[in-house]
Amino acid sequence: MSLLSPACDPAREAALVTGAGNGIGRAIAQALVGEDVRTVFADVSEERVMAAVKASARPELAIPFVGDLASPAVREALLKHAQSALGRVTHFVHSASPPRREADHAMAVSTETWAQMHAVNLEGGFHLSRELARELIAAKTPGSFLLLTSLHSGTPRNLPHYSTAKAGMAMLVKELAKTFGRHGIRVNALVPGAIAAGGFVADPSLARHIPLGRLGQAEDLAPMALAVLSNRVSAYVTGAAIVVDGGLSLTNWFEPPEI
């Protein structure tokens, strides 16, 4: 196929994006709508999600949903809402994650904050993926799932509730990719780093540690997300972790050479 061909097939595909009210989730959801894909925008904030829908290239293709995905009942309601609005979800993006506070280090994070982070990220990602896959398998329909993890799924962040939740998601991607692959459902991870969006507070001084010399924006993730989600572009890619970090993960205590 030509790389200039459309990434998606709007006649056969429909999407569900969590965390679609801001940051990376919003950018990916809007990019899907920009490809003419009917997309459910799910977020915990009604104000944010309605603003994201309104700002989309084709708001008539964007379906809002408001609810806290830490709740199993809300997750079930989201699945029913998506099925009612779209018929069948073929593309799933799990970007929802509670806010991070630098104060929540290992000696300070509360039991409630820990549970909320894991419930939204790991439990939400697992249960939504499993139920969406169940529908696709029954219908013998291929699908593509993308879970947002983090560089800190493998390196400490001083936020143990966040890092452990993302580490769990990284392994979840591999487990689901292996289980669902024979049914034509691909599951991959998108690994952002130093993206000025969502819970990350951008510190301009960080840019000097990034080989590409700048902080990333949520929009830097959207083209890669579309490519990985696309069954036309990435038909043979599953269980992969795609890093989009401007080279931040290459950083160590050595400075680059003067050339």
Give residue ranges: language-model regions.
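Alpha-helical segment proximal to the catalytic Tyr-Lys
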Residues: 134, 178-179, 235
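C-terminal substrate-recognition "lid" of short-chain dehydrogenase/reductases
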Residues: 218-244, 249
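Conserved glycine-rich cofactor-binding loop
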Residues: 21-22
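Active-site loop of short-chain dehydrogenase/reductase
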Residues: 12-13, 88-91, 136-150, 182-185, ...
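Catalytic loop of short-chain dehydrogenase/reductase
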Residues: 98, 144-168, 173-182
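Catalytic Tyr-X3-Lys loop
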Residues: 107-126, 146, 169, 211-212
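Conserved glycine-rich Rossmann-like NAD(P)H-binding loop of the short-chain dehydrogenase/reductase
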Residues: 35-51
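Conserved mid-core segment of classical short-chain dehydrogenase/reductases
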Residues: 76, 97-115, 158-161, 199-201, ...
